Amino acid sequence: MRCLVVLLAALALSQASGITRIPLHKGKTLRKALKERGLLEDFLQRQQYAVSSKYSSLGKVAREPLTSYLDSQYFGKIYIGTPPQEFTVVFDTGSSDLWVPSIYCKSNVCKNHHRFDPRKSSTFRNLGKPLSIHYGTGSMEGFLGYDTVTVSNIVDPNQTVGLSTEQPGEVFTYSEFDGILGLAYPSLASEYSVPVFDNMMDRHLVARDLFSVYMDRNGQGSMLTLGAIDPSYYTGSLHWVPVTLQQYWQFTVDSVTINGVAVACVGGCQAILDTGTSVLFGPSSDILKIQMAIGATENRYGEFDVNCGNLRSMPTVVFEINGRDYPLSPSAYTSKDQGFCTSGFQGDNNSELWILGDVFIREYYSVFDRANNRVGLAKAI
């Protein structure tokens, strides 16, 4: 009932002020879909899972592992073309390109999703430039074009759109999303591609040069708000954290503590706030210390399980950011499925970078402020 009241109030505010809202649907993660089909173990072995590769590329060719979106679970609708063609996308603050499958992609991966047909759009213009996003075992190949992109009540008549003609592997066959809409800085975008939010800012289509994200714990009422901060989604005050590198939404974490003792990120570390990842990644050595402290044990998928009966006695994990504490309770950093509880912390052997995904964002309403290059955090309702 509370979610319904909040949603109705938000919609009323949107209509009154011209604020743009995109409802986010919480769906099944690709990890869970693969596990249900008995495909996860083989997939992880073949992909040589390294989430850090999502965060190590600049230049003309984007490079992202297929596993980047293995844990994405919040999706929204956009429309491309005239008349509009509908797509479900991950609104991803960890990348900058917009791409969807096209009718020229004939693989089962594409056939299982909505595919854009440029021939049916009177406003489509082929840019004549290739798009290549490299994954662990192949490439998403395609091309760039211009077309009208509609996001809620915002209509951008001249947005660059990537259209895939080839997608690697069968893994995306089971995803609930069609494509990706990146919300990171333009320095991460492929050559000739302009990020959607940058276009909106340049054309003054948003009231303010910022956007905010609320992720409901139960998946109902989750919202991406463009051009505004909505106090109805958080309690207390927003606290601001400066962006340290204008590529991702990257900032400094002072330390990670348990029971007042620093167990990870000792002396400070860099972290990224990423809506395209549901879990919380960190260097394997640091994450292992956290797993040991919370009593988690590794399973055959490389995940860490905890005893569901121990949640009440497990410790709170606290992130200190810009001098303030952001605690994560056991109920926040674990997920329960079919009687098993899994830790929301995962390690990466190839990076010192921390990635604060939905595990963190569900607890803290997040504002991404491009005008001032900062992130705002407040306790979510």
UniProtKB/Swiss-Prot annotation:
Disulfide bonds join 105-110, 265-269, 308-341. Residues 1-16 form the signal peptide. It comes from the Eukaryota. Keywords: Aspartyl protease, Digestion, Disulfide bond, Glycoprotein, Hydrolase, Protease, Signal, Zymogen. The extraordinary high clotting activity, combined with its very low non-specific activity may be useful in the production of cheese types, for which a bitter taste is unfavorable, for example Mascarpone type cheese. Large-scale expression of camel chymosin gene in P.pastoris could represent an excellent system for producing active chymosin for potential use in the commercial production of cheese. Optimum pH is about 5.1. Activity decreases with increasing pH values. Residues 17-58 form a propeptide. Gene3D superfamilies: 6.10.140.60, Acid Proteases. The active site is at 92, 274. Residues 74-378 form the Peptidase A1 domain. Pfam families: A1_Propeptide (PF07966), Asp (PF00026). Optimum temperature is between 45-55 degrees Celsius. 50% activity at 35 and 60 degrees Celsius. No activity below 20 or above 70 degrees Celsius. InterPro entries: Aspartic_peptidase_A1, Aspartic_peptidase_AS, Aspartic_peptidase_N, Pepsin_A, PEPTIDASE_A1, Peptidase_aspartic_dom_sf. It catalyses: Broad specificity similar to that of pepsin A. Clots milk by cleavage of a single 104-Ser-Phe-|-Met-Ala-107 bond in kappa-chain of casein. GO terms for biological process: digestion; proteolysis involved in protein catabolic process. Belongs to the peptidase A1 family. Chymosin is synthesized in the mucosa of the abomasum (fourth stomach) of young (unweaned) ruminants. The enzyme hydrolyzes casein to paracasein. This is Chymosin. The gene is CYM.
